[in-house]
From Swiss-Prot:
This is Holliday junction branch migration complex subunit RuvA. The RuvA-RuvB-RuvC complex processes Holliday junction (HJ) DNA during genetic recombination and DNA repair, while the RuvA-RuvB complex plays an important role in the rescue of blocked DNA replication forks via replication fork reversal (RFR). RuvA specifically binds to HJ cruciform DNA, conferring on it an open structure. The RuvB hexamer acts as an ATP-dependent pump, pulling dsDNA into and through the RuvAB complex. HJ branch migration allows RuvC to scan DNA until it finds its consensus sequence, where it cleaves and resolves the cruciform DNA. HAMAP family: DNA_HJ_migration_RuvA. It comes from Clavibacter michiganensis subsp. michiganensis (strain NCPPB 382). Residues 1-63 are annotated as: Domain I. Belongs to the RuvA family. It is found in: Cytoplasm. Residues 144-214 are annotated as: Domain III.
Amino acid sequence: MISSLRGTVLSVSGQTLLLEVHGVGYGVSVTPRHALELRNGSEATVLTSLVVREDSLTLFGFPGPDELRAFELLCGVTGVGPKSALAVLEHLDPEAMAQAVAAEDDAAFRRVSGIGPKTAKLIVLQLAGKLFVTQPRARSATSAASTVTADVVTALIGLGWSERVARTAVDDAAAAAADQGLPADMPRLLRVALGMLGPQQPAGAAPTGQAADR
């Protein structure tokens, strides 16, 4: 059983991480939020859950033990498969899940695509007394910075730039802020990244001087 992987990030796109461990590349399914915290060429460690089906073996990866436990508990709920469990973790972190279950707030789960009213109620019912958070709420400065850069990348993607271009611009903006001794907060990074991307066209945008199709 593969419980964790540590290696070099070869590529990350959407919900798929390709991690090289001692010359072997492993494809790992992760949440988009987790994917945005990973960088090509960097070292990464993921805790994993191997889901076995008749026609497939799929690795799901998580940044910490709380996410892994929440995923496995969700997969044990009637009507919740691994993809739906991953979708829940994209919208609710383990602490938010624990709070929703404790408050019997099934509406928090109904907001997740693919989770209907019946399944949401089952999640609350079947996870009662099982879900808890083992790590402290306070985040390190590094973790907070990763979240800020991930949020800026997401914002740029929403404005039409590709993930690759957005990542590069945000990394450059963060490096510039560090060189100048300035705080790398979201407004600053977004403003600087947009300034760097100014001359470029977002993916799918009409070329300069041409009207968009109507």
